[in-house]
């Protein structure tokens, strides 16, 4: 069921994107995910994340995994035809300014989003990366239709903060969205012949600190939570892949579209 909008949100120019259908996870894929377990296969040690820069694919591109260093991981791979690194950076700089932007990403599960760094996000003297690096988003989302939405705070940092090699980043043609924890995650977008592909990783039991990546106490690998997270990630990023090229072309130079001066965000 779609998130209910306020009257002001219904008047938002982005409403046409809200009206677009959001596809469920394909039946065969959903059935495959529901059979997955963290015990099925070994993932990657966090220290090996710079292998993401290598050509080709790793054995752990999609599914639930136990890692050799003791943690666990959820991984997803999303084809994004027509999407570029510039679009993806723009999206993470732009969408945190207004809840309606977050809702159209996944209108069934996304309820609220507000960057805590509005001036930084609106600062046109900064690059798109600089407009979301070292910022915090307050969000409210559900991971499935039968779950209640819960609040969370997401911090976005430069990828080297979570262990990516600064030298490799200099020549990388894609982009990496990095969140240091308490659930350490990153979205590694790299170019393809028809656009980009997104390699998402969620590491349970890890956190980025001033002293580097540390292992932290974590609940035992929960297969049900892992499957729910993967299903949600498949749905939301598949939909973003569909709408992002048009959104970017229409609003890439408009960071204030639909912003309500009365604060109905």
What do the PLM-derived regions correspond to, one by one?
Residues 2-68, 192-265:
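Terminal "cap-and-tail" regions of soluble proteins that handle hydrophobic small molecules
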Residues 66-87:
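Terminal, regulation- and interaction-focused segments at domain boundaries
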Residues 71-73, 182, 195:
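A general secondary-structure signal for short beta-strands and their flanking turns/coil
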Residues 77-78, 183-191, 201-204:
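Hydrophobic/aromatic beta-strand elements that line small-molecule binding cavities or substrate pockets
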Residues 81-102:
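Amphipathic alpha-helical segments
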Residues 82, 164-167, 188-197:
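A short, structured loop/turn motif at beta-sheet edges
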Residues 101-112, 254-259:
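Short, glycine/acidic-rich hinge or "gate" loops at secondary-structure transitions
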Residues 107-180:
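Glycine-rich portal/gate segments that line the openings of hydrophobic small-molecule binding cavities
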